[in-house]
């Protein structure tokens, strides 16, 4: 798979902002069939940074109730990337 197909989009939430500032972790939504090795290579290639560790979380699809209606929420795969000391991704700076 091409690196731009593996990394779908960044995750920008309060939790990720706190992790970025304290432990140098950033998060991305990744392709559901990608593995840690592919994600690591894609991040290092696209952003020119050194990756220390990758943690991957799978969110299962589920049905939620909104306004008395059943709504299907699709599942996703999220990768938390720990960067090496001194490394940073310029996209996340200033958020």
Curated annotation (Swiss-Prot):
Query: Can you list the GO cellular component terms from the UniProt entry?
Result: ribonucleoprotein complex; ribosome
**Name of the gene this protein is made from:** rplW
Choose any GO biological process term that the UniProt entry carries and state it: translation
- Subunit composition? Part of the 50S ribosomal subunit. Contacts protein L29, and trigger factor when it is bound to the ribosome.
Q: Keywords of this protein's UniProt record, alphabetized?
A: Ribonucleoprotein, Ribosomal protein, RNA-binding, rRNA-binding
Per its record, how is this protein called by name? Answer: Large ribosomal subunit protein uL23
Family statement: Belongs to the universal ribosomal protein uL23 family.
Q: Which GO terms describe its molecular function?
A: rRNA binding; structural constituent of ribosome
Q: What does this protein do?
A: One of the early assembly proteins it binds 23S rRNA. One of the proteins that surrounds the polypeptide exit tunnel on the outside of the ribosome. Forms the main docking site for trigger factor binding to the ribosome.
